[in-house]
Amino acid sequence: MLLKIKSFLFSHQNIHLKSRNLWMVFGLACLVIIIRRIDLVTYPQFWAEDGTIWFATAYNFGWWPAIITPMVGYLQTISRLVGGISHLLPLAYAPLFFNLVAVLIRALPVMYLFSDRWYKILPNFWFKIVLALIYLFLPNTAEVHANITNAHWFLALILLMVLFGELST
């Protein structure tokens, strides 16, 4: 039994996904994230600092001062950038924009996991599917699930994946 599990996890069976298929994986990951909390799109609203700080600062002071203003000692660039860009939309759509950008950021690690840059690290395609499903269905993630305030955790994961991944050819 253990040998079967080992061969499943570490065999070198890899399916190379074309660019089109990577985008399909990305879209499927976004769909799973939205389905986990459907109110992200059916009843969008700001979450925590999304409205009170990121959107409000960009609204009151403009997008550039908002981007370069540190909060608690560091720059929250992505949060402030999304807050600034959201002013190009009608006010009623700003929370939806925040939520959709957060969903896209949350889905990025799944797409990157299936890219060819992770061929040597995780050669088994099925193991990548298992990892992606674990990542997408992690329990008790309501605090960080699809909001810009906590998007930096998923961006940190992407950074690690880029650092450990192979160079593109």
Regions found by a protein language model. Name each.
Residues 1-33:
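Start-transfer (signal-anchor) and selected internal transmembrane alpha helices
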Residues 22-23, 68-72, 121-130:
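Membrane-interfacial loop-to-transmembrane alpha-helix junctions, especially the N-terminal start
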Residues 32-51:
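Helix-to-loop transition at the C-terminal end of transmembrane segments
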Residues 52-58, 68-96, 100:
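Short hydrophobic/aromatic helix or loop-helix immediately within or flanking a transmembrane segment
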Residues 100-123:
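Transmembrane-helix motifs of polytopic, lipid-linked glycan transferases
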Residues 127-142:
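Membrane-embedded helix bundles of polyisoprenyl
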Residues 141-159:
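Multi-pass, polyprenyl lipid-linked donor-dependent membrane glycosyltransferases
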Residues 155, 160-169:
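Membrane-interface transmembrane helices that cradle and orient dolichyl/undecaprenyl
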